[in-house]
């Protein structure tokens, strides 16, 4: 097989070894050298942490107020019962949140098949033992909440949303992922004269809620969707929004009354229709001294007050007055 030095080999599905209904081995080859570990590790991490599924999240057991207790006639303590419920494998169609019920009495094991559910729910492991009743008169009733989610979510991370939950509603660590075990191995592969290629062997076990091949297919889809953003890589940063600087310093738009001049000086300025500080700073000393009743003492006062604000007489302001003042 002769090709361009820049052309990468694409793997093809070589074999699916179905060990059981929940256990399979998938072999992919050929892969370029190093790609076996690159792809195998990425798929393994997604399969372990990011696969969606359904899990028990809350339980209510008649006569039980908290998980650190026991129930008469039940061999296991409540913590062990909750642990067994975590092992329940459930498929739910068309819903993200369902309530299941269980009612059992008499001596013997209580199994997943004893759970009552509607047609949208399938118990994958009906023989899974939840607890044992040890007395003919013993009974147990519970309401089991099953929700759809992703990965593993401990009960402690959900307590902040359950501050007002009723007494007796027990939270369960939710293991949504249907994948129970995943391992991969990279072996040597050969294509014609090339002997430096990889063969990826993925071995996967699920709880039965999802077939192993479908789990790998979904993990590969998730990985491909995440990498799509890099295929058409471009700068997607938001353009900088430049703040428009005001045309005039805000202090120039304030009335001369804000300068707190003496009554004499203020009245002289108003008589000359000088209403804003912007009007005042454009006047020269000579112009102000021509104002009736405004002498050198008042002029000095005005100059000092303007100087304290970083202003002075004789300034030139383009486009004065602004439209907001001109309209007034």
UniProtKB/Swiss-Prot annotation:
Pfam families: RNA_pol_A_bac, RNA_pol_A_CTD, RNA_pol_L
Gene Ontology MF term list: DNA binding; DNA-directed RNA polymerase activity; protein dimerization activity
UniProt-annotated stretches for the region Alpha C-terminal domain (alpha-CTD): 248-328
Entry-linked InterPro entries: DNA-dir_RNA_pol_insert, DNA-dir_RNA_pol_RpoA/D/Rpb3, DNA-dir_RpoA, RBP11-like, RNAP_asu_C, RNApol_insert_sf
GO CC terms in record: cytoplasm; DNA-directed RNA polymerase complex
Catalytic activity, reaction form: RNA(n) + a ribonucleoside 5'-triphosphate = RNA(n+1) + diphosphate
Region (Alpha N-terminal domain (alpha-NTD)): 1-234
Annotated EC: 2.7.7.6
UniProt-listed GO biological process terms: DNA-templated transcription
Keyword Electron transport attached: no
Top-rank EC class of the record's enzyme: transferase
CDD domains reported in the protein's UniProt record: RNAP_alpha_NTD
Keyword annotations: DNA-directed RNA polymerase, Nucleotidyltransferase, Transcription, Transferase
Residue ranges the record marks as coiled coil: none
Keyword Transcription in record: yes
SMART domains, sorted: RPOLD (SM00662)
Domain comment quoted from the record: The N-terminal domain is essential for RNAP assembly and basal transcription, whereas the C-terminal domain is involved in interaction with transcriptional regulators and with upstream promoter elements.
NCBIfam families: PRK05182.1-2, PRK05182.2-5, rpoA
Family: Belongs to the RNA polymerase alpha chain family.
Assembly and binders: Homodimer. The RNAP catalytic core consists of 2 alpha, 1 beta, 1 beta' and 1 omega subunit. When a sigma factor is associated with the core the holoenzyme is formed, which can initiate transcription.
Function, in words: DNA-dependent RNA polymerase catalyzes the transcription of DNA into RNA using the four ribonucleoside triphosphates as substrates.
The protein's name: DNA-directed RNA polymerase subunit alpha
Higher taxonomy: Bacteria, Pseudomonadati, Pseudomonadota, Gammaproteobacteria, Pasteurellales
Gene encoding the protein: rpoA
